A protein has these predicted regions:
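Short alpha-helical transmembrane segments in multi-pass integral membrane proteins
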Residues: 1-23, 81-148, 194-253, 309-375, ...
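Transmembrane helical elements of multi-pass membrane transporters/channels
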Residues: 21-40, 142, 209-213, 217, ...
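Transmembrane alpha-helix boundary and packing residues in multipass membrane permease domains
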Residues: 26, 30, 42, 46, ...
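Generic alpha-helical transmembrane segments of integral inner-membrane proteins
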Residues: 27, 31, 35, 39, ...
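Helix-terminus/linker motif at the lipid-water interface of multi-pass membrane proteins
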Residues: 35-54, 123-130, 186-197, 256, ...
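Interfacial/gating helices of multi-pass transporter permease domains
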Residues: 44-64, 130-135, 199-200, 204, ...
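Small-residue-rich hydrophobic transmembrane alpha-helices
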Residues: 53-113, 150-169, 283-345, 379-401
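Short runs within selected transmembrane alpha-helices of multi-pass transporters and secretion channels
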Residues: 74, 143-161, 169-177, 202-217, ...
């Protein structure tokens, strides 16, 4: 079967339709993942109270920081895989998968072990409220055990998306979420034959869901003889190739640092929020849960844009990349804008799902949403622009932009302006950071040199015109033919 048919071809066809059809399963995966977190928050909040809810909010920020650290490695591998698939070079794509998978899993295990050992120091650094500290410790320690499986599942799904398949990741994300949701109340309350584990039961449910799902997706991919699977002689590709590993690390670390910058800003704001007590912290935690839904369209579109742009870079279809970005921005404005409007209209009924109707935290959370939620429309445009430029290997400018807009502007506004406008500074710091990031990202997209960059030396930059009869740059003339590859 031709290479393009055994993977997903994102280099032909109408761009808006192709982008939307690819993005919808990614959006579905994001919806399920966020729904999972929200439903778990409902179980924890209703069964165990506001202190437990604060504990999971603090612990989830730590988890996001860990996932962000290894996110860049997965993204670099995804872009390289997408470029190779676009160039119809599946042997190179398998080499990238092997090198990246080994390094990715090793780093995940290191983080899990270190996190387990230093969990108290991490929570104390966060300034976790005293009444939530024991609960956060119990929850986070089990989450650290789950980290390798969570990261491995994430890696497999991102690689499949780079190869043009967003439906398979959606199916197995659904499996993980269903298992997590089902086991949460059973293990929290000890229903039926299950032990009563309290907040640790919520984390254990996550561990079960992630482990079963990653095993299942690997079994299915090997049973289907997926072209990127490593079997037989190809298992030797799990031994890291130094040259490829250097590219993955050098390009992946800045992308991972982007997530760390966002996490660091979130942790800083959470630390300030915690100083106002458990009630404000719980309100902010619920608002942040809802913000994950608002950001889902932009994140899904960004993932689709990144894979689609990278495949077109690999195929030498430079004429399509700008239109991919424009379509992504348009979809973000429509979808994210619609979610913000819905949140403004139905915020209190939604907040009532997490907290009792007489909780003062509902009023606080509603105000937080009014002040900050609209800014995610702007940040969504930034996400799409970043996804486009990193398809050619431009990873440092987005990092610098995030450092300025999120770490300096957002956290600086929250910290220094609270002496002027009180806790309002925390909520309005989000629009301040989003406006800054959009202005800088748009400037780099328009005037920056990302079109002349490349990730692998023998692959020409996007600005180089094709000079062979194949319609691809000279460096691609020896690409793997479109023949069956097992």
């Amino acid at each position: 079967m031709p290479a393009r048919r055994r993977t997903g071809d994102l280099t032909s066809g109408p761009i808006p339709r192709t982008l939307l059809l690819f993005a919808l399963p990614v959006l579905g995966s994001n919806v399920l993942q966020s729904l999972n977190g929200s439903i778990n928050a409902v179980w924890v909040g209703r069964f165990l109270g506001e202190s437990a809810l604060t504990a999971t909010s603090n612990a989830n920020l730590v988890l996001f920081l860990i996932l962000g650290t290894v996110f860049g490695i997965g993204m670099a591998a995804t872009i390289l895989v997408a470029q190779s698939v676009g160039a119809r070079d599946l042997p190179e794509a398998r080499r990238i998968v092997g090198t990246s998978a080994t390094f990715f899993f090793f780093v995940s295990v290191v983080f899990a072990v270190c996190g387990w050992i230093w969990v108290d120091a991490i929570l104390n650094t966060l300034g976790t409220p005293a009444d939530a500290l024991p609960l956060a410790r119990s929850y986070l320690r089990i989450i650290f055990v789950a980290v390798p499986m969570m990261n491995l599942l994430s890696f497999v799904m991102t690689v499949l998306r780079g190869a043009g398949d967003s439906r398979t990741p959606f199916i197995f994300m659904a499996l993980a979420v269903v298992l997590d949701i089902v086991f949460n109340p059973l293990l929290i309350r000890g229903i039926g034959p299950f032990p009563e584990l309290g907040i640790a039961g919520s984390a254990t449910a996550t561990l079960i869901g992630q482990t079963v799902s990653v095993i299942a997706i690997l079994v299915v991919l090997y049973a289907r003889k997926h072209p990127l699977r490593l079997a037989g002689a190809n298992l030797a590709l799990l031994r890291p190739d130094p040259a490829l590993l250097r590219i993955v690390v050098f390009k992946g670390v800045p992308m991972g640092l982007q997530m760390i910058v966002i996490s660091a800003a979130a942790l800083t704001v959470m630390g300030i929020v915690n100083s106002y007590g458990s009630q404000v912290a719980a309100a902010y935690g619920i608002a942040a849960q809802l913000w994950t839904y608002i950001q889902m369209p932009a994140l899904a579109i960004g993932a689709a844009v990144s894979s689609m742009a990278a495949q077109n870079v690999g195929a030498g279809r430079w004429d399509r990349i700008g239109r991919v970005a424009a379509s992504g921005v348009g979809f973000n404005l429509v979808l994210t804008g619609a979610l913000v409007a819905l949140l403004w209209l139905f915020d209190r009924p939604i907040l009532g799902l997490f907290l009792s109707s007489d909780s003062a935290a509902i009023d606080i959370a509603a105000h937080i949403n009014t002040a900050a939620s609209w800014s995610f429309i702007l940040f969504g445009i930034t996400i799409v622009l970043f996804a486009t430029v990193r398809a050619t290997g431009a990873v440092m400018p987005p990092l610098f932009i995030l450092v300025i807009s999120v770490l300096i502007v957002r956290t600086g506004f929250a910290y220094f302006m609270r002496g002027v406008i009180g806790e309002e500074a925390l909520w309005w710091s989000f629009p301040a950071g989003s406006i800054t990031s959009l202005v800088l990202a748009a400037a780099y997209y328009r005037f920056g040199g990302w079109r002349t960059l490349h990730m692998i030396e023998n692959r020409p930059a996007a600005g180089e015109p094709p000079d062979t009869g194949l319609g691809v740059p000279r460096g691609r003339a020896n690409m793997a033919p479109e023949t069956p590859n097992g």
